[in-house]
From Swiss-Prot:
The chain crosses the membrane at residues 28-48, 55-75, 104-124, 146-166, 175-195, 208-228, 250-270, 289-309, 332-352, 356-376, 391-411. Disulfide bonds: none annotated. It is a multi-pass membrane protein. Residues 1-27, 76-103, 167-174, 229-249, 310-331, 377-390 are cytoplasmic. The gene is AVT3B. This is Amino acid transporter AVT3B. GO terms for molecular function: neutral L-amino acid transmembrane transporter activity. It is found in: Vacuole membrane. Ubiquitous. Its main location: membrane. Translocates preferentially neutral amino acids from the vacuole to the cytoplasm. Belongs to the amino acid/polyamine transporter 2 family. Amino acid/auxin permease (AAAP) (TC 2.A.18.8) subfamily. Keywords: Amino-acid transport, Membrane, Transmembrane, Transmembrane helix, Transport, Vacuole. The lineage of its organism: Eukaryota, Viridiplantae, Streptophyta, Embryophyta, Tracheophyta.
Amino acid sequence: MGLEEQGRAREDTPLLGKGRPLSSKFKTFANVFIAIVGAGVLGLPYAFKRTGWLMGLLTLFSVAALINHCMMLLVHIRRKLGVSNIGSFGDLGFAACGNLGRFVVDILIILSQAGFCVGYLIFIGNTLANLSKPTKSTTLMSLRHLMGVSPKSLYIWGCFPFQLGLNSIKTLTHLAPLSIFADVVDLGAMAVVIVEDIKITVVQRPQVVAFGGMSVFFYGMGVAVYAFEGVGMVLPLESETKDKDKFGKVLALSMLFIAVMYGSFGVLGYMAFGDDTMDIITANLGAGVVSSLVQLGLCINLFFTFPLMMNPVFEIVERRFWSGMYCVWLRWLLVLAVTLVALLVPNFADFLSLVGSSVCCALGFVLPSLFHLMVFKDEMEWKQRALDVGILLLGVILGVSGTWSSLTEIFQE
């Protein structure tokens, strides 16, 4: 196997690359954190505003428990099959139900990864447009009136040529360390927002609600599922763990820690701003220097995370349509498609809910429970069978209802 082939990414390739030594418990914990925590957390306060803080918390912790359970289902399936070359979700789909299984997983991974990148562009466009609101006539305003486009669209199109260049890189080894930067900036932004939330809450106590009603339940589920999406990384992470018998415990503790962090962030953000909570919480921080630096930092980290998240899409599309060979024009077409979708979607949090309700529900709930049913069908007790069927049906119901709810919200904008 040549060096170039070894450097090619697959849908199971961790963003930080695969290290030679196996991972300790702490490193596994950190890898789970990096694989899951992303920009979705910034939409949680707005989701709590829609669902109510108590319903939001219940939804968040329920989704965390379900995602953790379904991740472990994938691990149990691989151990049961005992096939050494099952390294990714797609490989497991093929082992469980042949080419159809791999095809379905591939399609959903393409949609989910591309959906994340659409969300990144929406965030960048909306944030930069918010930061650069002119107080008088400027070149930006002149361009807007001349071209008939919004500032958000101008910023997204401004990213486009640079993304073409970044996504033309065959191997992302040199960009991979930026995923560490992305998580550091995310944590920094969360810390700044939490501090500001506490300071604002002490001064003013806006009215908040505990339950927003069942009409927004599926909306909240979609945002929560998006925020915890990372099921495709569980197999490579488990493969790299030194003490595999303790992997389930480490994963559960990681998910609990992330859920507590997410819940605190969402509740404090909503408690601070109440009905004025915006779809991207950093926009509530005002126009100060610290706020601007945090928002610019988030834009930069998402800008460089974009090609990392698109890499699994390129791998799948090139494997299926270009014999696995590098194809720059195919990559450019995919980047163009993602850009065009980002231009059409107005609201960051609404889009999180759409992707979470549709694609992430299928990847996180439906497929793991379905594959588990198929592989363990001859030795399952009725309780386990009922649990798998229940999760499968829940995933389908949440997917259909949440997708409809999110599309309704988007088209009402």
